[in-house]
């Protein structure tokens, strides 16, 4: 199970307190069910849960300073070092959590070479599902390894099943 601190350490203090309160209070949805934190300039933050329920944090509007703070924390104050990841739209942080970023694309010769004016951040919470590959591992590994392509829409568990396959190997 991933630690909540791996995510909350990336957030501005005012947002961090609310996220911790929402997901750690007994009887609430809980961190184990938190799937995403959606953060967009001039909008309230949204907590998404695995059961497709959402909690809109109405009392906080995200500012450009909040976005800048999160980017600094995600890139450890070295945005240049993460430029390739940012260009691809996300950065993976400790615990396997993915931080999706969206802003204005910077292009050179018709190719995206970076982003500026980042206005949206989506934090995808990594979840370990031990045993989810149990039904397919024999097929993949019997008689030697087979080439396998895992395809599904976003958020349906591709990375989760790949991690479990690796755990078996």
For each of these PLM feature ranges, what is it?
Residues 167-169:
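Post-Walker A helix-loop "phosphate-sensing" segment adjacent to the P-loop in P-loop NTPases
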Residues 161, 165:
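Hydrophobic positions on the alpha1 helix immediately C-terminal to the Walker A/P-loop
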Residues 1-95:
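N-terminal accessory targeting/assembly segments
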Residues 150:
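Hydrophobic anchor at the beta1->P-loop junction of P-loop NTPases
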Residues 157-158:
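Conserved glycine(s) of the Walker
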Residues 59-60, 144-146:
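Short N-terminal secondary-structure initiator segments
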Residues 154:
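The conserved Walker
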């Amino acid at each position: 199970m991933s630690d909540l601190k791996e995510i909350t350490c990336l957030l501005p203090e005012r947002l961090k307190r609310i996220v911790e309160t929402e997901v750690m209070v007994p009887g609430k949805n809980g961190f184990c069910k938190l799937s995403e934190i959606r953060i967009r300039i001039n909008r309230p933050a949204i907590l998404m849960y695995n059961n497709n329920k959402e909690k809109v944090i109405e009392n906080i509007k995200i500012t450009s300073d909040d976005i800048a703070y999160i980017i600094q924390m995600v890139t450890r104050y070295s945005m240049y070092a993460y430029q390739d990841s940012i260009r691809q739209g996300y950065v993976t942080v400790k615990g396997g959590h993915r931080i999706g970023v969206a802003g204005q694309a910077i292009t050179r010769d018709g190719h995206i070479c970076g982003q500026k004016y980042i206005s949206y951040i989506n934090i995808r919470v990594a979840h370990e599902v031990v045993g989810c590959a149990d039904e397919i591992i024999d097929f993949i590994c019997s008689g030697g390894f087979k080439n396998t392509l895992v395809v599904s829409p976003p958020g349906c568990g591709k990375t989760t099943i790949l991690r479990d396959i690796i755990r078996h190997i």
